[in-house]
Amino acid sequence: MWGCWLGLLLLLLAGQAALEARRSRWRRELAPGLHLRGIRDAGGRYCQEQDMCCRGRADECALPYLGATCYCDLFCNRTVSDCCPDFWDFCLGIPPPFPPVQGCMHGGRIYPVFGTYWDNCNRCTCHEGGHWECDQEPCLVDPDMIKAINRGNYGWQAGNHSAFWGMTLDEGIRYRLGTIRPSSTVMNMNEIYTVLGQGEVLPTAFEASEKWPNLIHEPLDQGNCAGSWAFSTAAVASDRVSIHSLGHMTPILSPQNLLSCDTHHQQGCRGGRLDGAWWFLRRRGVVSDNCYPFSGREQNEASPTPRCMMHSRAMGRGKRQATSRCPNGQVDSNDIYQVTPAYRLGSDEKEIMKELMENGPVQALMEVHEDFFLYQRGIYSHTPVSQGRPEQYRRHGTHSVKITGWGEETLPDGRTIKYWTAANSWGPWWGERGHFRIVRGTNECDIETFVLGVWGRVGMEDMGHH
């Protein structure tokens, strides 16, 4: 009984296999020719690359060809041809019977010879014979890297940020960072050590915006201006002035004022130093972002930094008064805001935490790697997904950000990860509404190496005036 059923089952499977084979043969016989409009990729090495020439009909003697299938068997050389472009020359030693396409096919349209299209950050150019040649630059948005990060157990998720699409990794490093690493003299400046009181315990989580509501400002967007030195400095100073004035002054300070006017050893949208930025804020001061708005997100090393449009004079006791009207003609208030000298904190996480909790957000230098641009959410740490790739895929540069808090999170695998919360200067569309979390206590990306604090210059007359 079971033998009969087994025989019937095998017979049925054999019949289905034969039917599928016939359908495959019919599909090939009924398919339109590949070269009705001429041979695309006429210089392509298909049969030759595989050293493949088959007699008669051999459906397995096939290769992928521009989204279709081409063959290297004699059967392909019939009225309706589905031969690979080099079949006639390589297998038969004769010229092909079809002319090469004068142009290249992409996305359903034909491009003329020397026509171009962009594939992410790489330009592809059509050459004679119908084949494309594309640049091989590493792109800032790397879909393969996104997949590798999200498959791994790294504690954070990567994503495609449309504002970065079409940029090379080199352009991201050149235009989206912009803090020049301090000189050895500055890096060796004395640290101010913060001592925890006996029995003092810091909370497991803290966020500046919760302690000082309405006094912590949201991230701005530096665009393709390599000016993180100005944006992070203005961001920390804005919060510190707001906190130290007890909310009597709550300016969003102008990065453009620094970019255009702080020109001593600074390079505007081509990069700058933090010590120079804090010197300018202490000695000259800046106005609000409303008064002197950012000129545009497309400033870069190829465009000159706009000239300085704010000037001031000394009033005595180190204070400054503006002598220029606001570049934004719709704003009347041209008040100058200043700070005291910046000071460096120790690299111990508890010292940074205590300073942040008592006096407000701090500024941190960090090394940005190729995967950081793709950050979407979670607790960031630099991943090894680019190891083993050529050097041009493994780039890094110096950046500066504003640290606003800290916390801990238990991951699905049971690990507890400590983190900093920081504000970037790439706009609210990036990361966690413009912010990111990064592993705390291990000096991840050197973020605990060079941390600065500052006091807003606030007097009683300022409190009354504002």
From Swiss-Prot:
Q: Where is the SMB domain?
A: 49-96
* Induction / repression: Down-regulated in prostate after castration.
User: Main location per UniProt?
Assistant: secreted
Its cellular-component GO annotations read: collagen-containing extracellular matrix; cytoplasm; extracellular space
Q: Where is the signal peptide?
A: 1-21
- TM segment ranges: none
Q: How is it modified after translation?
A: Glycosylated.
Q: What are the disulphide bonds in this sequence? A: 53-72, 70-72, 70-84, 76-83, 84-91
What is the protein's name according to its record?
Tubulointerstitial nephritis antigen-like
* Originating gene: Tinagl1
